[in-house]
């Protein structure tokens, strides 16, 4: 399925049905009086966040959505039926913005959240409502109210606990495949990943989180270079960022500096998120080169990097557990609780004792 994370749609609620002008006609009843029913209300346009979706591709080919019109009222006091509602289903994490693409209407970040985009018009009153002591046979009724219409933007920001960032060809997709059951496209050239990929990390039956791999950033991405910073929105909700640096490249310090600069240029406090720095592809280096590269990266970043390899699996579990600690803190647990739960249980000397 193709990935689409933003689109513009037009929605229109239904008009209300008009009220009826009608009089009771019955044998032996000379003055039956008015009996016109009310018109039905127009249908609403709703939007709902549902699980199981991770793209807005359904709205790529159909952008116009109109709810049903209310039915007109009829004689004998019969009211018109309401128009059919329209329900738009979108992935969890979808934001609804006004046509200016800046004003946020709603952030549907929880499954089951709903929002009424356009309210249907009320149905008009039939002439039965206008009967009074002065005018006992009104020959007029109200028309139905018009529905609402508007253009809105839908922008998807994926719900991920941990985000992977790095330069193109840093090994992010290989790491995602090693850590989860996801199978992203992997190749030895830059920009293999063109759209975000999600995977679920299962450390144990009770320890799991969602990991997001976004397309690589290059210098000047904030100004539109490469794929730009458009996909950084998909890690805005993450509790922690895993910054992968390719250990086989020559300029280790420059790689880290480039990504940090683009995160700061993007804004939205992305640069302030917790960061776990990892030197990737260490399986291709000898022990001495590993130490030298790690020291160089620590000198420029001030963070001791973890040594990992998505190919051999070295250090992957340790890195994932470090990320999960930050996720648990984000979920409301204290650092102490997270550390206690992750600490290995000490075995009783001499085996089990009653």
UniProtKB/Swiss-Prot annotation:
GO terms under cellular component: cytoplasm
Subcellular locations according to the entry: Cytoplasm
Location of region: Disordered: 333-354
EC number: 3.6.5.-
Gene Ontology molecular functions: GTP binding; GTPase activity; magnesium ion binding
Top-tier EC class: hydrolase
Residue spans of biased composition, Acidic residues class: 339-348
Disulfide links within the chain: none
Domain named Obg: residues: 1-159
InterPro entries: G_OBG, GTP-bd, GTP-bd_Obg/CgtA, GTP1-OBG_CS, GTP1_OBG_dom, GTP1_OBG_dom_sf, OBG_GTPase, P-loop_NTPase
UniProt keyword list: Cytoplasm, GTP-binding, Hydrolase, Magnesium, Metal-binding, Nucleotide-binding
Any one GO BP annotation for this protein: ribosome biogenesis
Subcellular location, principal: cytoplasm
The family this protein is said to belong to: Belongs to the TRAFAC class OBG-HflX-like GTPase superfamily. OBG GTPase family.
Function: An essential GTPase which binds GTP, GDP and possibly (p)ppGpp with moderate affinity, with high nucleotide exchange rates and a fairly low GTP hydrolysis rate. Plays a role in control of the cell cycle, stress response, ribosome biogenesis and in those bacteria that undergo differentiation, in morphogenesis control.
UniProt protein name: GTPase Obg
Lineage, top ranks: Bacteria, Pseudomonadati, Pseudomonadota, Alphaproteobacteria, Caulobacterales
């Amino acid at each position: 399925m193709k990935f689409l994370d933003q689109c513009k749609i037009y929605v229109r609620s239904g008009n209300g049905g008009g009220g009826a002008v009608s009089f009771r006609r019955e044998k032996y009843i000379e003055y039956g009086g008015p009996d016109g029913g009310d018109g039905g209300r127009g249908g609403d346009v709703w939007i709902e966040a549902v699980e199981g979706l991770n793209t807005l591709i359904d709205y790529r080919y159909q952008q116009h959505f109109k709810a049903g019109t209310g039915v007109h009222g009829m004689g004998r006091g019969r009211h018109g039926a309401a128009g059919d509602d329209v329900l738009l289903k979108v992935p969890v994490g979808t934001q609804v913005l006004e046509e200016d693409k800046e004003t946020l209407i709603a952030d549907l970040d929880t499954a089951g959240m709903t929002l009424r985009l356009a309210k249907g018009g009320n149905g008009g009153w039939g002439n039965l409502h206008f009967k009074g002591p002065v005018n006992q046979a009104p020959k007029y009724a109200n028309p139905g109210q018009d529905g609402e219409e508007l253009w809105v933007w839908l922008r998807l920001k994926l719900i991920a606990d941990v985000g992977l960032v790095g330069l193109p060809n840093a090994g992010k997709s290989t790491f995602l495949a090693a850590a989860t059951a996801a199978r992203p496209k992997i190749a030895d050239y830059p920009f293999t990943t063109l759209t975000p990929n999600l995977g679920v990390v299962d450390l144990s039956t009770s320890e799991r989180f969602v990991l997001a791999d976004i397309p690589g950033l290059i210098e000047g991405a904030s100004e539109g270079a490469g794929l730009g910073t458009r996909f950084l929105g998909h890690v805005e909700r993450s509790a922690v960022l895993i910054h992968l640096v390719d250990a086989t490249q020559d300029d280790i310090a420059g790689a880290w500096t480039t990504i940090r600069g683009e995160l700061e240029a993007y804004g939205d406090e992305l640069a302030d998120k917790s960061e776990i720095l990892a030197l990737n592809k260490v399986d291709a280096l000898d022990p001495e080169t590993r130490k030298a590269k790690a020291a160089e990266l620590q000198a420029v970043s001030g963070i001791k990097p973890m040594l990992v390899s998505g190919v051999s699996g070295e250090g992957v579990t340790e890195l994932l557990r470090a990320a999960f600690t930050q996720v648990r803190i984000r979920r409301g647990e204290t650092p102490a609780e997270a550390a206690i739960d992750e600490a290995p249980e000490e075995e009783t000397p001499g085996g089990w004792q009653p």
